[in-house]
Amino acid sequence: MSTRQKLYRCIPLIGLLLTATIAEAIPSGAAVPKAGSPVFVTTAGQSADAHAVKLLLDRNKIAAGYDAIAEADKISGSKSLFLVMGGSSKGLGAAGMNEDEEIARITHILEKAKKEKMYIVGIHIGGESRRGALSAKFINLVAPQCNYIIVKQDGNKDNYFTKLGEKSKIPVTVIEETLDLVSVFKAMFAVK
C-alpha cells in the first residue's frame, strides 16, 4: 500500500477524532442566545460564584459591572443581568444580611430588570454543594424568571434546570466545568 493510500485511509479517522474533540468543548443543551452588553453581575444567595463569573467576563473583555450586594437602582443602564444562583450562609453573614433580606434584594433586582427589558441570565456553577435548602430558595426565585440558564452538570444531576427549561420554554445550556463558561460567553457576545 502506498503512502498516499495510507493517508487517504487515515483521513476519516482524523475527521472523527477532530469532531469528537470539538464536540467535547461545546456545552450541551440549547443553542447559545445572543445577549447585549454591558452586563451586570450579582449573586442570588451570596455565594462567591458570582465573582468567578465576573472574572471570566473581564478576561474575555466583555463589559460587566459587579456588586454582590447591589440594590436594584445599581443595575440601570445594563442590557443583560447575570444572576449567579447559590446560597451561602457565610456569604450572607459577611454581607450583613439574612435570607429574607437577600430574597427581597433579588426580587427588586428582577423587577427592575424586567421593567428595563434586560436579558436575564441565571447561572449556577456551584455544583451539587450549592443545591441545598438554602440555595433552593434563591434558585426557585430566580430560575423561572430567566430568559436563559447556564448550569454546571454536577448542579443539575436531578435535571431540575433541564426540566424547568422544558416546562417554561427557557433555553438551558449545561456545562461540564466552570471554565466552559468562556465558550458560552464568547458565543453570547460574539467575542473571538
Regions found by a protein language model. Give the residues of each.
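Short, charged N-terminal beta->alpha structural module
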Residues: 32-59
